A protein has these predicted regions:
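One-face residue pattern on beta-strands with alternating periodicity enriched for small/polar residues
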Residues: 2, 12-16, 80-86, 102, ...
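Extended, low-complexity, turn-rich repeat/linker tracts enriched in Gly/Pro/Ser/Thr and Asp/Glu
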Residues: 2-9, 21-24
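Short coil-to-beta strand junction motifs in C2/discoidin
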Residues: 7-14, 120
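Extended extracellular/luminal ectodomain segments enriched in beta-structured repeat modules
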Residues: 8-10, 93-96
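Predominantly extracellular/luminal cell-surface or secreted proteins
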Residues: 16-20, 128
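Extracellular carbohydrate recognition and processing domains
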Residues: 24-95, 115
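Extracellular carbohydrate recognition
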Residues: 75-77, 91-95, 105-129
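Cysteine-clustered segments with highest specificity for TGF-beta superfamily mature ligands
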Residues: 97-101
Length: 130
């Protein structure tokens, strides 16, 4: 990656390996334009994914593992990083059926808490697994 981290801001890259168990569900939507944002937010540290966190009947699936990288300093030249995936032991035998990758130049920009000077570029993303 490379990019500029504006004043008071951070960039973020995270990845979730998920098992979507709701029939036909192949993605997770976060509605950043809604006043209900906290009900749809994707938090990789949480075990389950819901369309609405306040409604258990909206369960979409569970997170098998996740990795997270917060970037707090600007990087003018390309930098290679490895993001380790932290797996939940109880799902060790499962294979994920959906990969969620999120990259944001301003990781709290959806809350208007960032900098308009931030930018983030990604290149040559590679997943290595056994």
């Amino acid at each position: 990656y490379k990019g500029n981290v504006g004043s008071g801001d951070k960039a973020r890259i995270f990845v979730c390996l998920t098992n979507m168990t709701k029939p036909g569900c192949t993605y997770h939507t976060v509605n950043t334009k809604s006043s209900e944002i906290d009900k749809t937010v994707l938090d990789p540290t949480q075990e389950f994914l819901y369309t609405n966190l306040n409604d258990p009947s909206t369960l979409e699936g569970h997170i098998i593992g996740y990795g997270d990288l917060l970037i707090e300093q600007s990087q003018s030249s390309w930098k290679q990083v490895d993001i380790q995936i932290h797996y939940r032991d109880k799902y060790a035998s499962e294979k994920p059926n959906v990969l969620i990758l999120t990259a944001s130049a301003s990781y709290r920009g959806d809350y208007f808490e960032g900098s308009t000077d931030s930018n983030l570029y990604l290149d040559d993303i590679e997943f290595i697994y056994e």
